[in-house]
Amino acid sequence: MLILLPMSPEIASYNSIQSPSDKIICDKLLQKMDAVLTNAVSKIWHAHPVWFIDDNPIAGYSKQKAGIRLMFWSGASFDEVNLNIIGKKFKDASIIYKSPEDIDLLDLERWLQKSIEIQCDYKNIVKRKGRLDRLK
């Protein structure tokens, strides 16, 4: 049984417009992200739920053709085999969930902890003309 913690109305609205299976995935991600990222602020950013620490994006999810994509802005530095690194310029990494059963809660919690401990400075990337520095 899925027990939901209090959530932002905007993220609840985002989750509610997903297909039934995708909504379950989104709700599971939201519950775990809110439970682990207690010092983060969550909001809809560029039309998707994103969690921030000190105005720096660290994690979020979005609907893609392939499923629900969970992304970590500094995930390329996590050294995790199940996270896919697509680009070279930025330090993001992600995983696609096609069904609620795909979510490994132990992996998810570990990745969320790493998103707190390992952060690149996306907040100031424009000021630094595209250079991405590590904060933590």
Language model features: what each stretch is:
Residues M1-K136:
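Charge-dense, helix-prone N-terminal extensions
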